[in-house]
């Protein structure tokens, strides 16, 4: 596990962003192996979010029998008035398996409405089954026929940053 506080990546560097006709979707992994590579401020923000919502995450995971769920922050942004969204249809593919959302911890009131005004955003922490290869480059995110394979580029950036984080931490330990 990389040490926290030595990363330089921004949230946009690890977020997957794609559009359907009505929506812009942003998917951000909350796995510690990934967020520890963020800049200290961004890491603090993401780890703080997980900490603040820990009880709700744990309760949702327990309700669905998931001892160690994979967490993502997911945002749906309305590109037109009354844009419908169905978060249950946001699937992730990894190592030949498809993962559907198991549970949701809403972060905005719009999440439960399943419809967005133009320029409105619905955000939640989405729980998936464990078993995704987040450090591999084969993660595919799909929603209603649209998908992105941009994770391949993110995975390369994560690998470079992981090496740099360990080097920076080692150098800091020698001072």
Model-derived features with residue positions:
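Conserved functional micro-motifs across diverse proteins
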Residues: 1-175
């Amino acid at each position: 596990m990389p040490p926290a506080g030595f990363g330089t990546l921004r949230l946009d560097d690890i977020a997957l962003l794609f559009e359907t006709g009505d929506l812009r979707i942003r998917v951000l992994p909350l796995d510690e192996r990934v967020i520890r590579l963020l800049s200290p401020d961004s890491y603090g923000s993401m780890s703080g979010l997980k900490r603040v919502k820990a009880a709700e995450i744990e309760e949702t995971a327990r309700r669905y029998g998931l001892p160690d769920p994979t967490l993502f922050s997911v945002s749906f942004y309305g590109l037109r008035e009354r844009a419908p969204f169905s978060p249950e249809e946001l699937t992730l593919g990894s190592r030949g398996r498809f993962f559907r959302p198991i549970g949701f911890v809403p972060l905005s009131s719009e999440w439960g409405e399943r419809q967005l005004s133009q320029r409105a955003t619905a955000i939640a922490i989405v729980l998936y089954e464990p078993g995704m290869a987040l450090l591999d480059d084969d993660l595919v995110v799909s929603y209603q026929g649209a998908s992105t394979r941009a994770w391949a580029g993110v995975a390369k950036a994560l690998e470079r940053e992981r090496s740099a984080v360990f080097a920076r931490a080692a150098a800091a330990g020698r001072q």
